[in-house]
Curated annotation (Swiss-Prot):
Name listed for the protein in its UniProt record: Heat shock protein 26
Cross-referenced InterPro entries: A-crystallin/Hsp20_dom, Alpha-crystallin/sHSP_animal, HSP20-like_chaperone
Pfam families tied to this protein: HSP20 (PF00011)
Ranges annotated as biased composition (Basic and acidic residues): 191-208
Amino acid sequence: MSLSTLLSLVDELQEPRSPIYELGLGLHPHSRYVLPLGTQQRRSINGCPCASPICPSSPAGQVLALRREMANRNDIHWPATAHVGKDGFQVCMDVAQFKPSELNVKVVDDSILVEGKHEERQDDHGHIMRHFVRRYKVPDGYKAEQVVSQLSSDGVLTVSIPKPQAVEDKSKERIIQIQQVGPAHLNVKANESEVKGKENGAPNGKDK
């Protein structure tokens, strides 16, 4: 391999690229905001005037094309990525190959299941059927009933759980409301009169 070809390969491998290529690939939440340099004109050492970040005819471009081709196979399983940060639990994945009606997100016990499936359809290389299932465990302290999911217009599915609120240590204290009533001395005098009457043997009924 010549020196110019080697330098070209190193230069091209350092170019940023979009992370949204593979089927159901787990993405870090911040990766959604990384955009490719698709329109930036790059220099070429080997004389290939290519406007894309990685020239398709270069060795790096051929490797990238092979990786994309492998991503369309059903037997490829990419590692899932879950992120727990200050905003809570979050999972992002590329599902651009699926329609919204072909995606399903559900909670089973303490796990989140994400499934995508479409029947056999024709593409540029023939017919293909895609299907993937991913399972994520709900972190300790998080509530499974608060799981929400969003699908962006560019095909990124985000499943998240808000961060649990801190539980305040409240003592078992209860404020008793004071009720305002009439004068208390009237009730006391009435009770004393009844007691004295019983001590003197006052008849309770009629004399015969």
